[in-house]
Amino acid sequence: TYFPAPTDYGEMPLIDGDSLKISSEDDRPVVFVFKTLNDPSQGRISFIKVLTGTIEPGMELVNARTRKSERMAHLYVMCGREMTEVGHAYAGDIVVVPKLAAETGDTLSVSGKIEAAAFKFPNSQYRIAIEAENRGDEEKLFTFIDRACEADPTMRIERDEETGQTIISAVGEAQVSVLLNRLEERTKVEARTVPIRIPYRETIRRVASAQGRHKKQTGGAGQFGDCYLRVEPLLDGTDYEFVDEVVGGHIPRALIPAVDKGVQETMKDGVIAGYPLTGIRVACYDGSYHPVDSNEMAFRTAARIALKKACEDADPVVLEPMENITVTIPESYAGAVMGDVSGSRGRVTGMDTNNRGETVVTATVPYAELVDYATRLRSLTRGTGDFTMEPAGYEQVPYDVQKHLVEFYEESRAQGR
């Protein structure tokens, strides 16, 4: 009595440019998943709207995205927190279906070939790392937020394997704040936000050589390893290359892999600031061994000593990740945005106007300067700006930045952190 009948809508446009006629009499139902939640009693539940036709419990429909069949075992009508089971749903009805694998925005139909236009969600531009106050609650924290992300497509959660951080992407700070409050209320897990760690790298800029010698005598069988390494920068984008140049049996062939292993172990922690070493060729060109005391452990240790010495003489530098950003803003804010890019050690690479009359600025900026860019851009443009970014490789950091990173690393080591 308050809204027009669904059949009055006529035809609904589809993604492929075709249209779908709305009718309750159609024996080929089409439904659209517009929300997904995790209910405490029912588990995963999907809110669906019947676009056309009629559905009943036990019916199987095919997901257009996954091409997999999904069975709607039960249909419920939601009223507040109460769920009432029903025997059918017609075009225009909204019902709840438990335990579907479908995600928000999916279309299900008899053929699986019909796909309604999904929602266009705002970009999740705000990124922040979170951690539980109690380390033992980390898994519970991740599980809760992962389920929250299923219900809210504007949020994403990921684990950075390199830094070990759990990172949330959201529309803004308020969304994350509400999520953490809900986490504490429902699970008693306290969590806090922390800055995102930047995945810096280290490399070298010139060729250098060094000897690594490890000798240890403890009364019984000792340890002896001796190798000469030459390091040189790789300029073709390759991360690492190991070359065996030993001749004359100065190091037995069976122990060469131990040298390689010792080198790679050292590369994980870098040589000046604690970041992984990359873009380096290492050649083992000489050494010596003891027929009794030489073993794999001794040569791994010798390789670590030699690599650190060689890299310290090879002009080591710190690299930082760069991002290509595309910022869309009203023309009146172009100057402020480009000034901010320049002040963030970035380079403006282009400026254009899109078909809506907005200014589009492209730039390359260090990732370290972009971790709070969503908040900064909102302030610069009074909430009217939008941006996207994608990785653009690594570049050497300025001298003052490297000095700060090295000093911080040395201070942390001195304090045992």
Task: State the predicted function of each range.
Residues 1-417:
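Structural and coupling elements of P-loop NTPases
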